[in-house]
From Swiss-Prot:
Keywords in alphabetical order: Calvin cycle, Carbon dioxide fixation, Chloroplast, Photorespiration, Photosynthesis, Plastid, Transit peptide
Listed CDD domains: RuBisCO_small
Leftover remarks: The basic functional RuBisCO is composed of a large chain homodimer in a 'head-to-tail' conformation. In form I RuBisCO this homodimer is arranged in a barrel-like tetramer with the small subunits forming a tetrameric 'cap' on each end of the 'barrel'.
Naturally occurring in which organism (per UniProt): Mesembryanthemum crystallinum
Transit peptide residues according to the UniProt entry: 1-56
Lineage, highest ranks first: Eukaryota, Viridiplantae, Streptophyta, Embryophyta, Tracheophyta
One GO term describing the cellular component: chloroplast
Upregulation: The most highly expressed of the 6 small subunit genes.
One GO process term, biological-process aspect: photorespiration
Location relative to the cell: Plastid, Chloroplast
GO molecular function, one term: ribulose-bisphosphate carboxylase activity
Full protein name: Ribulose bisphosphate carboxylase small subunit, chloroplastic 1
Keyword field contains Transit peptide: yes
PANTHER family: RIBULOSE BISPHOSPHATE CARBOXYLASE SMALL CHAIN 1, CHLOROPLASTIC, RIBULOSE BISPHOSPHATE CARBOXYLASE SMALL SUBUNIT 1A, CHLOROPLASTIC-RELATED
Domain of life where this protein originates: Eukaryota
């Protein structure tokens, strides 16, 4: 009894626009030579992901001339109400609030050579002690106001520390000095 092996090369054609010339078509898996009823997949790369046809309009954040701060740093300064909500979120998660300040560099910078190191620009001075047992956001905001009076030209951030896991869970700039021009 003779057996024969049937082989057929699967050829996929992709219709591309000039903007998609450098993109790679999605992998559709191995083609089956058996005649199973299957639905034909569209090989057009625009069917993979879409944002409503506005692909040409997307932009990235400009990397030059923008200082890197903490979480929420791309937003305008927080109002007192927004700040209270952030601190309440921190407290609701069981994190210990703590204030830190930096009088000269409120952003990541390279101090120890020309290659980025984890600790470059990340050591800030702690304002007093962590606020263990704090349950009211107004206590944290009162400490923030006190730190602003003591160091009006410093960047001040609020961090939330998880004392069970021993990690910092949240950190955001709460005050930027008036001399800093965003």
């Amino acid at each position: 009894m003779a057996s024969s092996m049937v082989s057929s090369a699967a050829v996929a054609t992709v219709n591309r626009t000039p903007a998609q010339a450098s993109m790679v078509a999605p992998f559709n898996g191995l083609k089956s030579v058996a005649a199973f009823p299957v639905t034909k997949k569209n090989n057009d790369i625009t069917s993979v992901a879409t944002n409503g046809g506005r692909v040409q309009c997307m932009q990235v954040w400009p990397p030059l001339g923008k200082k890197k701060f903490e979480t929420l740093s791309y937003l305008p300064p927080l109002s007192e109400e927004s700040l209270m909500k952030e601190v309440q979120y921190l407290l609701n998660n069981g994190w210990v609030p703590c204030l830190e300040f930096e009088p000269t560099h409120g952003f990541v910078y390279r101090e120890h050579g020309n290659t980025p190191g984890y600790y470059d620009g990340r050591y800030w001075t702690m304002w007093k002690l962590p606020m263990f047992g704090c349950t009211d956001p107004s206590q944290v905001v009162a400490e923030l106001e006190e730190a602003k009076k003591a160091y009006p030209e410093a960047f001040i951030r609020i961090i939330g520390f998880d004392n069970v896991r021993q990690v910092q869970c949240i950190s955001f700039i709460a005050y930027k000095p008036a001399s800093y021009d965003a």
